[in-house]
Amino acid sequence: MKKLVVIYSGGMDSFTALNKAVKEGFDVYALSFDYGQKHNKELIYAQNVCNELNVPHKILDIKSISTLFTSSSLVSDDINVPDGHYEADNMKSTVVPNRNMILISLAIGYAVDIEAEGVWYGAHSGDHLIYPDCRPEFVKVMDQASKVANFEPVYVHAPYLNTDKIGILKDGIKMGLDYSKTWTCYQGKEKACGTCGSCVERLEAFQANNIDDPVQYSI
């Protein structure tokens, strides 16, 4: 059985990717990160799912890097997480500079250590506009760099790179997944806000698939 590291935030995109990898027969190792995000509640969801799936899971504490990213509303207490759709200009404040390169680099190192052949992460087409490190050109060069950075080549793959959240949910429905086991909201409060870009995109995906979102919202 081929080993695979899946970067798993606890959100619906990486939740679907994680389950996809398990169902495809990979020996999956999940890796989550506490990088100082306001919505670190997602890590509880990630741990619970991995326990249910019997998937080895590490949560890496790298909160100290948040001091480098004071311009991001996801980690800075001085900036409010904006409401609205990802297409709005104010959503750029949710960018954590170089986040995916940092997280993927750590995942590659982990993959080399456990002799895994690849790293998956949950980038999708809905992220392309706002997040440069979710675009096809980034995935391509990160994959190339990974294969020359170590003696052991590790590939980097985003299984939903050319699919939006609507399509991801559609695939998850086919797999029979329970999305009450995911946390999407950037606010990290008791209930999902329903108004941040992440919530808006999630709600649109459920509406497009004609099913109810099992998560409770404060709106």
From Swiss-Prot:
N-terminal signal peptide: none
One Gene Ontology MF term: zinc ion binding
Pathway connected to this protein: Purine metabolism; 7-cyano-7-deazaguanine biosynthesis
Catalytic activity, as annotated: 7-carboxy-7-deazaguanine + NH4(+) + ATP = 7-cyano-7-deazaguanine + ADP + phosphate + H2O + H(+)
Residue positions binding Zn(2+): 185, 193, 196, 199
Segments forming a coiled coil: none
InterPro entries: QueC (IPR018317), Rossmann-like_a/b/a_fold (IPR014729)
CC cofactor note: Binds 1 zinc ion per subunit.
EC number(s) from the headed UniProt entry: 6.3.4.20
A Pfam family recorded for this sequence: QueC
Gene Ontology biological process terms from the UniProt entry: queuosine biosynthetic process
Keyword Nucleotide-binding: yes
Function: Catalyzes the ATP-dependent conversion of 7-carboxy-7-deazaguanine (CDG) to 7-cyano-7-deazaguanine (preQ(0)).
Protein name: 7-cyano-7-deazaguanine synthase 2
The species this protein was found in: Colwellia psychrerythraea (strain 34H / ATCC BAA-681)
Encoding gene, per UniProt annotation: queC2
